[in-house]
């Protein structure tokens, strides 16, 4: 569903109307439902990858934060049991190593999934070229995987969240569905931008009342964006495409 399509305009109009008609406590769950529905409209199985990415970073973030709090509590309550500052330092280093290992493992899992979808056939193509160059008849079959829409955006947004938790810039989100909304929020799911949790979360989760001035301001920004896309960018694309043909 392209942002410039009539289907998307109809979708956003209905979503906007319902968002301000439902009880305000249900606004963020409503955003989650329509975001998942929006993504599923591109491919019924696509939300599975979105859920996996969200679950990995959600669970890893919770464990990292909980482990750090438990470590601090243990040190505070058992400060006298450490024989020296060096022993206390080594204890903290062991805890930090466990948290770092989990964080790196989560990063590698998500990057591996992204890499398989984006670069598996590229790697296979180069390996086949090497086989051909050395005179081998061996040829690997292409995977022909269909790249899930927006997987790069939500993968890096999920990883950004996890890194912020690890660096103690934010608290881990305790509600999985709120975390899922942050990862899957439909206006940025396909074309970005990649947002920081600290910048977006409060706006997503808080209750909103209809504000005419804000709505007009939002419509002005949308129309300006459409102008830049349909009039400026598409015109330049047509001109450059024609130029590059010659």
Describe each PLM feature range.
Residues 1-246:
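Membrane-embedded transmembrane alpha-helical bundles that form the catalytic cores
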């Amino acid at each position: 569903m392209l942002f410039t399509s009539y289907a998307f305009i109809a979708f956003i109009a209905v979503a906007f109307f319902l968002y301000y008609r439902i009880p305000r406590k249900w606004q963020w769950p409503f955003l989650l439902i329509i975001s998942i529905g929006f993504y599923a409209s591109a491919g019924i199985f696509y939300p599975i990858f979105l859920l996996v990415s969200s679950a990995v970073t959600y669970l890893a973030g919770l464990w990292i934060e909980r482990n750090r709090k438990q470590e601090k509590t243990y040190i505070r309550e058992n400060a006298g049991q450490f024989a020296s500052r060096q022993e206390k330092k080594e204890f903290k280093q062991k805890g930090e190593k466990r948290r770092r290992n989990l964080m790196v493992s989560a990063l590698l899992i998500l990057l591996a999934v992204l890499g398989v979808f984006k670069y598996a056939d590229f790697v296979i193509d180069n390996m086949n070229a090497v086989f051909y160059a050395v005179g081998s008849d061996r040829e690997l079959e292409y995977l022909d995987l269909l790249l899930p829409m927006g997987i790069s955006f939500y993968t890096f947004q999920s990883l950004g969240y996890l890194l912020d938790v690890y660096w103690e810039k934010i608290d881990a989100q305790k509600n999985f569905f709120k975390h899922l909304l942050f990862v899957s929020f439909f206006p940025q799911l396909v074309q970005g931008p990649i947002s920081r949790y600290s910048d977006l979360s409060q706006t997503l989760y808080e209750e909103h009342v209809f504000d005419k001035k804000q709505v007009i301001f939002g419509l002005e920004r949308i129309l300006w964006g459409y102008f830049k896309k349909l009039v400026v960018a598409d015109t330049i694309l047509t001109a450059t495409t024609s130029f590059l043909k010659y």
